A protein has these predicted regions:
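Charged, compositionally biased N-terminal leader segments and the immediate start
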Residues: 1-23
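Amphipathic, non-membrane alpha-helical segments in soluble helical-bundle scaffolds
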Residues: 2-9, 31-38, 57-64, 83, ...
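Active-site flanking loop/helix segments enriched in acidic
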Residues: 18-47, 51-56
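An amphipathic alpha-helical micro-motif enriched in hydrophobic residues
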Residues: 41-49, 54-79, 87-94
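Short, polar/flexible loop-turn hinges at active-site or ligand-entry regions and domain interfaces
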Residues: 79-84, 105
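Conserved small/polar residues in nucleotide/adenosyl-binding loops
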Residues: 114-116
């Protein structure tokens, strides 16, 4: 039974909050730190690469989910320390991508691939 609500990403954030809950969460998840989770993040990125190399779309989808979980995990760790949260991560990458693509989002005309 799914006890979470909202969009799938909201549900994933709620799931991580539950896993990290100080008294009702998972003992393993509660003990994790940025440093202890980092190797899993790298491992998941390599698993995405492997699934892409195998052209296995089902595995790509699954591994991207595992990688997304790592981002949500790190964001939750940061939120608990008052550093930032998942929404801030998303806002920052949105801003960065818009700034890096003035030819798409700005007043500049469309550029060819050679000029990008």
């Amino acid at each position: 039974m799914n006890e979470f609500s909202g969009s799938p990403i909201d549900q994933l954030k709620q799931l991580m909050e539950r896993l990290r809950h100080p008294t009702e969460g998972c003992p393993w998840d509660r003990e994790q730190t940025f440093e202890s989770v980092a190797p899993y993040t790298i491992e998941e990125a390599y698993e995405v690469e492997d699934a892409i190399a195998r052209k296995d779309s089902e595995a790509i989808c699954e591994e991207l989910g595992d990688l997304l979980l790592q981002i949500v995990f790190h964001s939750r760790l940061a939120e608990e320390q008052g550093l930032f949260d998942f929404d801030t991560v998303a806002e920052k990458i949105n801003t960065k991508m818009i700034e890096r693509h003035p030819h798409v989002f700005g007043q500049e005309e469309q550029l060819s691939l050679i000029h990008i």
